[in-house]
Every structure is written in C-alpha cells, then in structure tokens.
C-alpha cells in the first residue's frame, strides 16, 4: 500500500507512475477524500475538546449556583455526544473508502524500470549458456513424459479435472529431487533459513502480501474462509506481520518448499497442454526482509541466487528486467529469469525476483528501529522463485532429451536420484 502522505506531496508522480502501468489517474480523488477525512478528524477533535471544557464549566456553574448555565451547557454536551456518535460512523466510512482505493493501487515503479505497455518493452540484461542443438526434432515435455509412461494427464483429469498432472517413477523422483536440491543450495550455501509453513492462511495474511483484494479470483478459498497459498511468499513475508524488528536483525532471509494453488482464472486458453500452467505445483520460494538502504542490493543478490540454481543444472537462460506494464502489482522492480525450452523453441519464465519497497510492510504494519533513532520505519520486502519446480522439470526434460526419448539427469541432481543417471521408459 502506498503512503497517503507521499501521494499528497507527489500527486503528479503518482499519476505518471500509474499511467506507465496503464492505469487511470487517482491522485485528485485520493487527495480530496483524504482532505475530507482529515477535516472531519479536526472537527471531531474540536468537539471532544469542547466536551472536556464543558465539563469543567458545569462544575464551576454548580459551585456558583448558576443552574441556568448548568442546563444550557448540559444541553450543549448532549448535542456534542450526538455529533460524536454519528461522527465515528462517518470517520470509519471515510477511512474505509480511502483504504479501499489505496489497496487497489499498485506499487510505484523505480526510475530504473523500463517504461512500456507489456512484455515487448522488457529488456534482456544477460544470458547464460547456449541453447543445445539436436540431430533430431526436439519434443515438448508432455510428449517426452507420456512416451516415458511417467507423466499422465488422463489420470490427473479423472482425479481432479484440467490443469493437473500425475507423475510416477523416475519423474516423480526427479520432481522431489529438484525441491531438495534447490532448498539445499539456498539454505546451505546462500544463507536462507528453511521454513516449514501452513498452506492455509487468513484474509489479513493474503492482504498483507498484497494479493487481496485484487487477486481474489486467482485464489482458492476454503469453506471456512481461509485461503490456499498461491505462493510461499504469502506466509513467508507475513512472518514479520505486526512486528517491530531492530535494524541489526536484518536482513532476514527465508526459503520454503511448498505446493502452490492457483485458479488461473485469467489464463483461459493459454498453455492448456502439459505442465506449464497448473492449478497445483511445487515451488521453492525466497523472501527477504530488509531496510530501505539495502533493498536494491538484496534484489541483485536474490536474483543471483535463483540464477545459481539454473547454472548448477546447466540450463540455458536469460534474465530480463520487466517493464512498467508487465511487472507485478506489489513490485517496484522485477527481474524475470527465463529458461530455454527446445521443444517450444523459446524462453519461458522460470523465476521472478521482485523488490516491493515498503509496499507490503505498510500493509502488514511490519516495522524496524534504527540504532539511536526512535522513529519506526516500515520494512522493505523482496520475493523470488528459487525456482518453480514443475517448470524446471520441463526444462530438464527438453534440454537433456536424447534421440531415443530418454532423459539424461544433470550431474548436480544425480546424488539425489540414488544412482539414476538416465530416465528411460
């Protein structure tokens, strides 16, 4: 959530930033509503002060035996009580109206973010590896998996409907190995703390991560009003919800392996075949909680951590900085890492690393105190995929496929595969 004080002081910057995201101006409406709310608060404060002074005047009038004055002031106090009663309702309504609008406004892109309407304006900043060449036409992952008889979409559909997959045998082991490998890299070598999390969270937790109210249609909700997590970012970033930290405790770096659940309401007709876009998938997530001064440094570090996973797996990838029209709601800068998929003949997103500034910290009321400074500051938060396991499995199948349909296991994963170096039918 944005700071209304910043909006009052920078209305043009707000509207320019929103325009770069393809969103209509909001500054005038927000400032008018905020002015009405603040003016009303002043009226309430004046009424409360008058009520307090009236009590003193009543005591003085009683002492002087001036009953007429007592009755007049008592009548005035009753009017003030009536006003304050209705004023509380109005103040609540104004505050809720302001917060409703603020909660629907995305974060402000940093100046270093390229301006553009969509992914066409994204900028590639680096490559790793060279896409492999084959002496045969490379297959897509779903053909490879089904030919191996270890990837079954028909059974998954019978169990759960569209956009689910059943893996078996060595492919199921490969999926598990990827999660263990990624966690080991991030925890043992990158300094993240491993966290085991609930998969069901409450409204305020999803709101704190800036996924409510805007993305409610993309989420699954249980009958008791809780939400299945769409990413481990949601509970991880909220580990500091409502807390006051000390600067010396930061950064906090968390990593977690969880299933993720998404309705994919906005993806109708896209990637309908295979595992690229599923209602349920595994992902290793990274979250950092840090200070304003360190947040951009942390973004570069987090992105390098995600890239390191793909480098160890020797998968070709490129890293792009997203444009203002393509970046996520809570982000003020995002790097996407896109892995090469020979079967599709293109790069596809496998990780997204974002810095959110104090956007989530403000929603969560998560703050920190600096040495010698009594002022509390909202924490800055970052999140990144480290990486999406299903998409990494897809990349391994397509990049390591052989002419006979078998799959070579990357060397980094073989210790997790109990001696399996090649997957065959």
UniProtKB/Swiss-Prot annotation:
Pathway this chain belongs to: Aminoacyl-tRNA biosynthesis; selenocysteinyl-tRNA(Sec) biosynthesis; L-seryl-tRNA(Sec) from L-serine and tRNA(Sec): step 1/1
GO cellular component, one term: cytoplasm
Biological process, per Gene Ontology: selenocysteine biosynthetic process; seryl-tRNA aminoacylation
Residues reported to bind L-serine: 231-233, 285, 385
Catalytic activities: tRNA(Ser) + L-serine + ATP = L-seryl-tRNA(Ser) + AMP + diphosphate + H(+); tRNA(Sec) + L-serine + ATP = L-seryl-tRNA(Sec) + AMP + diphosphate + H(+)
InterPro entries, sorted: aa-tRNA-synt_IIb (IPR002314), aa-tRNA-synth_II (IPR006195), aa-tRNA-synth_II/BPL/LPL (IPR045864), Ser-tRNA-ligase_type_1 (IPR002317), Ser-tRNA-synth_1_N (IPR015866), SerRS_1_N_sf (IPR042103), SerRS_core (IPR033729), tRNA-bd_arm (IPR010978)
Binding site for ATP: 262-264, 349-352
Any one Pfam family match given in the protein's UniProt record, by short name: tRNA-synt_2b
GO molecular function: ATP binding; serine-tRNA ligase activity
Entry EC number(s): 6.1.1.11
Subcellular location: Cytoplasm
Keywords: Aminoacyl-tRNA synthetase, ATP-binding, Cytoplasm, Ligase, Nucleotide-binding, Protein biosynthesis
Free-text domain note: Consists of two distinct domains, a catalytic core and a N-terminal extension that is involved in tRNA binding.
Function: Catalyzes the attachment of serine to tRNA(Ser). Is also able to aminoacylate tRNA(Sec) with serine, to form the misacylated tRNA L-seryl-tRNA(Sec), which will be further converted into selenocysteinyl-tRNA(Sec).
Family label: Belongs to the class-II aminoacyl-tRNA synthetase family. Type-1 seryl-tRNA synthetase subfamily.
Self-association and partners: Homodimer. The tRNA molecule binds across the dimer.
Protein name listed in UniProt: Serine--tRNA ligase
Organism of this sequence: Bartonella bacilliformis (strain ATCC 35685 / KC583 / Herrer 020/F12,63)
Taxonomic lineage: Bacteria, Pseudomonadati, Pseudomonadota, Alphaproteobacteria, Hyphomicrobiales
